[in-house]
């Protein structure tokens, strides 16, 4: 993991098209702004984990493909 230090209003750039800016620092909380292309999904980790759990549950409950012949 790369660890970077940034101050308020400083940023980092990922892959030339994703910019992360430190918007605010208040106590032990940091607010970040993310500029990314629309096709790049950006989620808080807890939201991402919930999406993954929902996708796994959907896949587990999805009917078998009718083209599958055993």
From Swiss-Prot:
Oligomeric form and interacting partners: Homodimer; the beta-strands of each monomer intercalate to form a hydrophobic core, while the alpha-helices form wings that extend away from the core.
UniProt keyword annotations, A-Z: Bacterial flagellum biogenesis, Cytoplasm, Repressor, RNA-binding, Translation regulation
Gene designation per UniProt: csrA
Protein name: Translational regulator CsrA
Function: A translational regulator that binds mRNA to regulate translation initiation and/or mRNA stability. Usually binds in the 5'-UTR at or near the Shine-Dalgarno sequence preventing ribosome-binding, thus repressing translation. Its main target seems to be the major flagellin gene, while its function is anatagonized by FliW.
A molecular function (GO) term: mRNA 5'-UTR binding
GO CC field: cytosol
Subcellular localization(s) per the UniProt record: Cytoplasm
Organism: Rhodopirellula baltica (strain DSM 10527 / NCIMB 13988 / SH1)
């Amino acid at each position: 993991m790369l660890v970077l230090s940034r101050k308020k209003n400083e940023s980092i750039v990922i892959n030339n098209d994703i910019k992360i800016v430190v918007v605010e620092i208040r106590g032990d909380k940091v607010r970040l702004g993310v500029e990314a292309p629309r096709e790049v999904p950006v989620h808080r980790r807890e939201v991402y984990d919930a999406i993954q759990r929902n996708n796994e549950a959907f896949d587990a409950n999805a009917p078998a493909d009718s083209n599958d012949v055993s």
